[in-house]
From Swiss-Prot:
Part of an ABC transporter complex involved in carbohydrate import. Could be involved in ribose, galactose and/or methyl galactoside import. Responsible for energy coupling to the transport system. It is a peripheral membrane protein. Belongs to the ABC transporter superfamily. Carbohydrate importer 2 (CUT2) (TC 3.A.1.2) family. This is Putative ribose/galactose/methyl galactoside import ATP-binding protein. Disulfide bonds: none annotated. Transmembrane segments: none annotated. GO terms for cellular component: plasma membrane. One of its GO terms (molecular function) is ATP hydrolysis activity.
Amino acid sequence: MSEDYVLEMIDITKEFPGVKALDGVQLKVKRGTVHALMGENGAGKSTLMKILIGIYTPDRGKIILDGEELKVSTIKHALDRGISMIHQELSPVPNMTVAENIFLGREPSYPFAGWVKMKELVKKTRQLFERLEIDIDPNAKMADLSIANMQMVEIAKAISYHSKLIIMDEPTSAITEKEVHHLFRIIRSLKKEGVSIIYITHKMDELEQITDEVTVLRDGKYIGTKPSHQMTRDELIQMMVGRELNQIFHKPKVPIGEVALSVQGLTKKGKFHDVSFEVRKGEIVGFAGLMGSGRTEVLESVFGVTKPDAGDIYVHGKKATIRSTRDAIRYGMGLLTEDRKLTGLFLPLSVEDNMITVTVNQYTKAGFLQQRKIREDCQRLAEQLSIKTPSLQQLIKYLSGGNQQKALIARWLLHNPDILFLDEPTRGIDVGAKAEIYHLIFELAKNGKAIIVVSSEMPEILGLSDRVIVMHEGRKMGELTREEATQERIMQLATGQLIETKR
């Protein structure tokens, strides 16, 4: 092995019942570099990383760390050898302090008594934070931290294990641009110390900003590795999906119909104030804004998740009284939530069971479920949406993020709503699955659905929307037509600057 490499994974193969998750995959990471691992959801990235940190055992292949073959049997074994992973779904102990989370199970303690030396624990945490330029109180409760700060704590925890190799899974998926810059500063600092990072992302613009090399997997196979600065966007997409995607957004011309939903003066103290908008049949309205701008909160209030303090909602021209999500569903609404794992999926249930949670009463006759009808309808939608699963009885937690998201969309298609709210519909989803979901959204609009899309991805807002509503600190700052909407104009409004538009 070349001395340049801190890690080599060679000919890694892993099979599960009915599916070969990895087939002869390789990954080589140079010391002191950031190595991007990319591929569609279901390409094998997660399985490969789970093998590296000891969750799975490969059926074939070998792992070489610092020139020595390594057989990783447990997560603790991986940590002891200097390999740690920061997961996309953070799971801190919320009622413990920052310092206690970092050194959990390794707390400095008094001999015999077993009491934790709290002052020493806090001191070690402060020293770690100073090294990483992290400004967080070691005594703060984890439950009180933002997602970005939780992430910083996880990085500090990884460094506290003297990790030589850190895996970061979608580290920028839920943090602001300012927080991303801070994260990148820390990553560059770690590189200078000789730490290597495997960086899993779907955001192509991050490749040149922070990574040195890119490895692409597709359908459980190794496709190739190239220096990041030599990889064009088109080439990367071609490697990831196995086909060219010259245009992801093929927006068909759709006749815009009558107003399906009108919201007037919606207000919730501390969240949003005097928000008014409407969406018509066949129209896609994008909600843009920075994190914390109130976009999600407005949709949740319209959908009955929370109760507004003031405002009126009209559905098809008639005033609607919505006190619960059940009321919203009766009015023909559907909501794809922002966090599919936290508020969307029932992870212990099957794909089929997740698809029918909203419509289960429609399939009940004389107190019995119409299993054949359920199976037929779910199978039809699974084929229509290209949901990749060995069976509809497969537990949904085993599906890739993109396929989980499609199953949630299928849930609402079974309900057949007139008005559909899509909150971050492609978060954590690869480019191929995104294209499929965009096509589906356009088809829904073509069929007369009124659609509102909340997205933090600018190309998504610009590519999908007939109109763009921009929020800033709980207020509607402006509304742009498709022709008026540009990245610069949206960012101006999103940061609180007023601009002149036709409206």
